[in-house]
Amino acid sequence: MDRLLNCPNCLKVFNNPRQLECDHILCTRCIEGVYNPGRTPIIKCPVCDKHSIVITSIDKSFPLIHCIEELLTYKYKDCNYDDSLSIPLNNSTGSSNNNNNNNNNNNNNNNNFVINNSNNKNNGATTTTTTTTTTTNSNSNSTKSKVVVNDSSPNLISASPKGLGSSQGSLTTINNQKKLTLSPQRASSTTTTSVNKPPLKLKAISSPPITPNVSTPERCFVINDKNKHVMISSETTIHNVSGLSSISTPIVSDAAIAELSKCNDHDQKKFTIFCTDCDQLLCDECLNNNQQQHENHQLNKIIQEAEKRIGDIESMIITTSLCPNRLINKKNKIEKIIQDSALVLKDTKLKITTDIDTMIENLKERKNALISQIDKEYEEQKLELKDQIETINTTIVDIQNNTSITQGIVSLYLNQVDSEMLSTSLLKKYSDLKRMDQLSDKLSNNLEQNIEWKWEPEYHFPQLFTRSNGEKTTVVYRTKRVSVGVSSSPTGTGSNGTPQQQQQQSANGNPTIITTPPLPPISANSPSPTSSSSSTLIGNIIKRSSPPHLPLSSQNYDNFGSTPPRLTTKLSSPNLSISMPTFPQSNSVQQNGSTSSIMKQQSHGSKLNDNINTNNNNSPSPTSSSTTSTNGSNTKIQLKNPVFGKLLTRKDSVITARRNWIYGFSDHQVEIYDNVTKVWRGGSKIPKKSIEYSSIYDNNCTIYRFGGKETPNDIYCYNVDRDIWEHNKVKIPSKRNAHCSVFDGLRYIYLIGGADRDSSKLLERFDIETQQWTKLASMKFGRSYFNAFYHPTKRCIYVLDGYVNKDKKSSVEMYSLEKNQWSVICEINQPRYLSGVSFDGSKYINIIGGVDRSNSRDIKTMERFDTSTHKWEILNNEPKSLLSHTSSSMNLMVVQSPQLKKNNSFSSISSHSSLNSSSSNNGISGSGGSGGDNEIPTEKMQFFNTSFFDGEQFIFFYGINIDEHGPLLYKFSIKTKKFEKIPIDNTLDLFSTLIFVSK
């Protein structure tokens, strides 16, 4: 039993024993010896090498074994205890005499259970640790036969407390004494004459290992030590005597013992033998029926096996007694988790309720603030309108008076009334009428640009959202996209207006973008345009080059009544490196096209003059921002008001400052131009040089480069935020170069055609989210070096021009995304290449210039394809003024504000006189004819590469001049009507790709 009280690691008596997760019990100091809290929370058991984890501390992680503590307490307490139980046996001679003497001298002291204290002496008597001993009393010669129980056993303990009236350490006599006799097995194993035998210690936990013929005491007393429970083997209950505790133990009945000794499988026959190999009890029937099973097995008597295994049984009892403690700990943990979860649930409910209540209060405050702001803006706008009405009334009266007076003077003058005074008055009134005309134009333009548009439903209160300092700002729509609709005009062609940008200063000096709506079409009764004419012309150019699918941004929504386009196009030839058109993405207003849109607009100017009086009934739609192009169609952009059109989320209403960059991709590296600092800086290196690839910008921050002559199956991705290139593991299924790619504004990129024979007709779709390819229907004709556009309203793709077949014919094909079907629409009147092709995003595809495929000569005409009627219209009025040809070149002329007079039309696009006259008249063009001395020559470009709009007030043109060694980049301001040259001192060349990014 002593080995159970020793630590298996230090082999000493347990000191604060604790149980590890592997069920081994160690001293606390041994556990601390193998625990290194500074390095690891894992403890390695020195007995079995299994790991245990210390969560917080050793005391909280490993339970203390209380039963061992109790055993140690009773072993080392300061009461008189004996360490062992000695059983003296009668000698073979004189045993009867000794017994008689004992009975005569100490009738009450024979065969008693006593508590041995090894540190004291009782009346001079000496107690030995041998099984057979003879104790001599100094006062009496009698021999006492005693049974002493080792206090290490927690069950069978007899007590003789000091406070019961006996002398120093005297034994307490228990009534109803019963003589103790040993079983035959133990009696035979003892020696009557020798004391050199090892002590026989009784081991018992629940019951003493004594055969039924051994008498046990009916009662035994123990000291109540700090209310610690002690198991006592007794048939009776000990009552409180002089402060002693009464302890009751369960009594196993004889019937239960008899039931356990019978076999349940064979009619309750008694077990007769134990099979050590099978580790089970057997009756005679079990042994007879299963002879083969127990053949060659070792069989043993039940009594001998029980004697052999009593130690294991005791160990198993102790081990099993620990199981409830572990289960109780687990149960307590679960109960604690339930309690903690209830607290967390309560706190979470409270937090949710508080947050939602706070949100409701904030929404109510926001609602009241918006309503107050709307009322305030309404009153301000109403006062402004009243002031304008008074100004208009005054101007009308002045005009009427001057007109009537002038008419009278003209009548006198026509009646041949010749007078110097009359002539002077006539000229004076003529000057007054011109001044009044200019004043009327200025007033009308001011009303259209700054007043009227605010009262259209789409533009009610566009500046509701303000910063904390009260400065007006814009609402950013990061991912919202709109489709561009088309509304045909029944009266033919006309002129359209364009949004104007005005930079105003807020109260604190910070600039705020205040925008204007699209101008209404010019009618016969409207005054001739003045300073706004050039803006209108540029607006037409922008609108006719608008992207096929333009997502909204902060600048798009608040700064433009119509879609601001951005052009990115490369003209190409079979022997030149090209980049096919790229389409607009979310944060960058990007679009296919070239400066041919300007020439197209100018070439159509004379026709516009002839039809300028046919659109007097066209006006902006009250429910949308509308612009009227030169062909007489109204382009409607459905824009929702930020308050009434949709419920803004936190993401939608984020206020951000936007910056613009130009990304150029040369053969060597990425060149980045900051539009604020006006400085070029080098980016990352190009991973692999290639030509004839197509590039496109997605809705996030990635520019895809598909194919190319050197990399026909590769996809390279450039991250504009991280300035890194990545080689996409996904390959293009077919070889692609000299092809086109279009983006639907959502998630799909379409690759069309190419120079390779196997892929010249193929159409494949790339999903930028799943990175998977899908093969779609093929075109009717193979194409390369062509142009393609996506029509968002019809959900179709138009492809036209390029190298189609040997007979030098060119056609227009349309692909329906819903039907997955190609159809040939018509043929192009004049097949060409190296031409400027643009799509206005709604109705017309325009082709200008280029080289005739039949004779390789320059083409001087411009054609326009109507996507609604599928018909071509040739616009060839004054082609010489439209295209100034030197070699195979197209000259870019400054677009100024021409006067609507018979001797000056929109077709005269050379920069005659208007710049000087406009600057001398505060932006109002003079009336000079062809320009004369006021003519200002401009730079000339050939092979226009890229044109795009920055979304505010600048149009960028990228190309080459035959007299220059490097490419040219110009920035044209639609506000000041001036060109500004951006120096290029980097690796860009003519065929580099330029992409505009706004964030």
UniProtKB/Swiss-Prot annotation:
PROSITE patterns listed in its UniProt record: ZF_BBOX, ZF_RING_1, ZF_RING_2
ZnF start-end (B box-type): 258-302
Domain of life from the UniProt record: Eukaryota
A UniProt-annotated Pfam family: Kelch_KLHDC2_KLHL20_DRC7
Zinc finger extent (RING-type): 7-49
Repeat positions for Kelch: 655-700, 702-745, 748-793, 796-842, 844-892
Positions annotated to bind Zn(2+): 263, 266, 286, 294
Coiled coil ranges: 355-402
Feature: compositional bias, Polar residues: 165-196, 552-612
InterPro entries linked to this entry: Kelch-typ_b-propeller, Kelch_1, Kelch_domain_containing_8, Znf_B-box, Znf_C3HC4_RING-type, Znf_RING, Znf_RING/FYVE/PHD, Znf_RING_CS
GO molecular function: zinc ion binding
UniProt xrefs under CDD domains: RING-HC (cd16449)
Keywords attached to this entry: Coiled coil, Kelch repeat, Metal-binding, Repeat, Zinc, Zinc-finger
Region Disordered, annotated ranges: 92-147, 159-209, 485-637, 904-936
Record-linked SMART domains: BBOX, Kelch, RING
Biased composition (Low complexity): 92-143, 485-516, 526-536, 613-635, 904-924
PANTHER family, per the entry: RING-TYPE DOMAIN-CONTAINING PROTEIN
Protein name, per record: RING finger domain and kelch repeat-containing protein DDB_G0271372
Annotated source species: Dictyostelium discoideum (Social amoeba)
